[in-house]
Regions:
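SF2 helicase catalytic motif II
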Residues: 153-205
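Intrinsically disordered, low-complexity accessory regions that flank the conserved helicase/ATPase core
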Residues: 1-21
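Conserved glycine(s) of the Walker
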Residues: 69-71
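Walker A/P-loop NTP-binding motif
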Residues: 50-62, 73-92, 106-109, 113-118, ...
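Pre-Walker A (Motif I) flank of P-loop NTPase domains
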Residues: 58-64, 96-98, 146-147, 201-202
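Conserved nucleic-acid-binding Ia/Ib motif block in the N-terminal RecA-like helicase ATPase lobe
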Residues: 32-35, 39-42, 91-161, 169-172
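Conserved pre-motif I regulatory segment
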Residues: 15-66, 176
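Short, conserved catalytic or interaction motifs in soluble domains
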Residues: 29, 76, 86-89, 113, ...
Length: 205
């Protein structure tokens, strides 16, 4: 639902000039992210993005509600990448700096696919960890070091128990579809995961 906008222009393959009325630039996002969105014709934020991105950029905890297709992924993904970019700390093996927790593998894959171009353009790394996917590639990526971890609760608990990942460096914890995670009975796992995340970090729901 993230690579959509209320105003789209034809996709560009050459240099991108950000228009003065670009809505994402007006929100205060880093130029590289704004340019990458503009390259795909994404120039005008959806209401949920307008409402949540400024508070998220200011470091506040944010609760956003929206249906599929409302632009929630960009609403939390853009300010999270902006924060990590401003922080500038290097990657540390097994210690991601931001976490997106989602209820299902399918949703995790959607979030990963949506954020991949943005993660790439700011020179960061991300990894999806979920059941039904290779342990070997997931653990290998964590050992090399990533900035953003997208995970389902069960697989993340498993990797925590194996010592393959640590959450002590998480600056932003995002619960995507938190209501669905509760309905699916994941609250004990989510509680345990958040207990491993340092206090004082940012929470986006």
């Amino acid at each position: 639902d993230s690579w959509t906008s209320s105003a789209r222009t034809p996709v560009s393959t050459g240099p991108v000039t950000v228009a003065e009325d670009n809505g994402f630039a007006a929100l205060g996002l880093p130029e590289r992210l704004v340019e990458r969105l503009a390259r795909d014709g994404i120039t005008t934020p959806f209401p949920i993005q307008d409402a949540t991105i400024p508070d998220a950029l200011a470091g506040r905890d944010v609760l956003g509600r929206g249906q599929t297709g409302s632009g929630k992924t960009l609403a939390f993904g853009l300010p999270t990448l902006a924060r990590l970019l401003a922080d500038g700390s290097g990657r540390v093996p097994r210690r991601p700096r931001a976490l997106v927790l989602v209820p299902t593998r399918e949703l995790a894959m959607q979030v990963s696919d949506a954020l991949e171009p943005l993660v790439h353009v700011v020179g960061m790394r991300h990894k999806l960890v979920a059941g039904g996917l290779s342990y070997t590639t997931q653990i290998s990526a964590l050992e090399r070091g990533i900035d953003l971890l997208i995970a389902t609760p069960g697989r993340l608990i498993d990797l925590l128990d194996r010592g393959a990942v640590e959450l002590g460096s998480i600056q932003v914890a995002i619960l995507d579809e938190a209501d669905h995670m509760a309905e699916m009975g994941f609250l004990p796992e989510v509680t345990r995961i958040l207990d491993d995340v340092p206090e004082g970090g940012q929470r986006l729901l």
